[in-house]
Amino acid sequence: MWKLSRSRVLLDEPPEEEDVLRGASPASAAAQAPGASLRGWKEATSLFNKDDEERLLETSRSSKSKGTNVRLKEELKAEKKSGFWDALVLKQNVQPKKPDQMEGWEPPKLTAEDVATDHTEDGISSLPPWSAWEDDTKGSTKYTSLASSASSSRWSLRSAGKLVSIRRQSKGHLTETCEEVE
């Protein structure tokens, strides 16, 4: 797109005018340019004071010295307060703790009724809860091998029952949503 517009601009302007401007004296070129008169220059320079110029020059000179740079950096650090984003950065760097490692956290206590309803929902009421497996893994971050445990058949039956109940729930949920769509 730039090449097209650039070529159009070059084609629109005849090359002879450029030669005329190059060969002309600077005074005649300034006279042809809009706002380049002596009056325009005086108006532009009257906007600025000598005091402004000196102040700007002093700040540019002082920032080049090493001592002032060190002081400026220290002042910026002192002025900088912990803001909203700084708090978020600090929170992200903190590793989350497991619930059982936190102070004051206790696992929920199940009553006999909760355990009974849990077993009847799964259809497996003869199997004991998973408390033996939880005791073995408490405090460790590694996975536990269920095949090496003494009652591996119990765990496989328990997990199979859980999977069946999950599948039934998800299939029932999907069929309800499909009927609603139609």
Swiss-Prot record:
Pfam families listed in its UniProt record: TDRP
Bridged cysteine pairs (disulfide): none
Cleaved signal peptide residues: none
Tissue: Predominantly expressed in testis.
Keyword NADP listed: no
Subcellular location field: Nucleus; Cytoplasm
Keyword Signal: no
Primary localization: nucleus
UniProt keyword terms in alphabetical order: Cytoplasm, Nucleus, Phosphoprotein
Compositional bias per record (Polar residues), positions renumbered to this chain: 59-68
Region (Disordered): 1-71, 117-152
One record GO biological process: spermatogenesis
Family listed: Belongs to the TDRP family.
Record's function text: Contributes to normal sperm motility, but not essential for male fertility.
Identification of the protein by name: Testis development-related protein
Taxonomic path: Eukaryota, Metazoa, Chordata, Craniata, Vertebrata
GN (gene name): Tdrp
